[in-house]
Amino acid sequence: MSHHPHSLRNSCLIRMDLLYWQFTIYTITFCFSHLSGRLTLSAQHISHRPCLLSYSLLFWKVHHLFLEGFPCSPRLDEMSFHQFPQHPVHVSVVHLPIVYKGSMTQVSPH
């Protein structure tokens, strides 16, 4: 029995870490629905550091990654962000040395 209303067989789940210098500040999970053609993203802030990245900045950096690797490249306006209310998203710092750890790893649905 799945807790999700839509079957996971119709989605592609990918999880990756976003690093600031050597510190992982976000764990990002993506879900691409092959039925709706929509890519959704959730970013969990897992660092004790302040929330430095705006979601709009994550939006652009993540989009460029998916233009190459996704089976069906999502349009920009089809990307939506799940806001974590405990972390403000209006702060915009655009000159961070962003590093993506290794390759994106497929998340096996349980």
UniProtKB/Swiss-Prot annotation:
Record's protein name: Uncharacterized protein encoded by SND1-IT1
Gene label: SND1-IT1
